[in-house]
């Protein structure tokens, strides 16, 4: 009898169910006796023994279903060693649940914070396999994360829709795209959506350069401008501040997000009406796109093979079009950021896209 636990942690995305399905279908097809324990609401389920035994029926018809059938929650890594309000040792509780159920392995689906806790559990002696989930595409060691392509599609659609109204009213429009620390989603959606200006966390912007780019378009007879702005975009002035100083500034800011500050500064300089559109959590929602369905089926199948090989302590990555087992110890806690000198940035700039630098 092979007993495997599974949980989804952190922010949801479109392809979590597809990834779990890939794991279970491959295991069910190749392992004679199998029990799947689904922990509810992420690490909380593992800590407080909230789980249910899943059957193949639970994974039928979920390939196209967004969200997660197990539920999810955020359990910050920095608090994992801190006892809960009742004094419970969370790490010890997770180990106890794992051993009490007699699990052979635990498949954890999540992003960077989830991955760090997965590695902690590996260090504590649990058999762990991590599947890289995030719309941000910022997990080190894999070329792509599941959820990223689906989110690109939604963010691109948002920019596409703004184009028509911006053109009709000769407006400057900012579309705010998810991504506090990295700009992968904004970069890809911005290029795909034909944004004229793209602002990323990795490339601090000069507001004067942004204004010049808009002014240049106006002089060329182009009455509207589209900006794709990441949630974590930062000006050169703010980038020069210490982390503590920047946090203080944000706490005192009158703006709900950086996009509104950018809009205000453009409006002040050019006297133009600037509108902001925020697709927000729609970027996490809906059905996974075909690419993510294929990716998750492959990653899930590869995770099942690692389980059958009893090769744990790894993340199942996609590298050069091939699935690969990457040691968790080598990647946990590392962030994959956009390289400002990358070929893609250079190619985008060659087409006239302004990055504010």
Task: Label each residue range with its predicted role.
Residues 3-11, 69-71, 104-109, 173-176:
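Short glycine-rich or small-residue beta-strand-to-loop segments that form or flank ligand, phosphate
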Residues 97, 108-110, 116-120, 148-167, ...:
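Accessory alpha-helical/coil subdomains and C-terminal extensions
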Residues 1-50:
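N-terminal phosphate-binding or glycine-rich loops at protein starts, especially the Walker A/P-loop
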Residues 121-145, 199-206:
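Short, acidic/small-residue loops that bind anionic groups at enzyme active sites
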Residues 261, 316-357:
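Phosphate-binding loop/pocket of nucleotide- and phosphate-handling active sites
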Residues 12-23, 46-47, 91-92, 103-119, ...:
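Short glycine/serine/threonine-rich phosphate/pyrophosphate-binding segments
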Residues 48-106, 146-153, 157, 357:
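Glycine-rich oxoanion-binding loops at beta->alpha junctions
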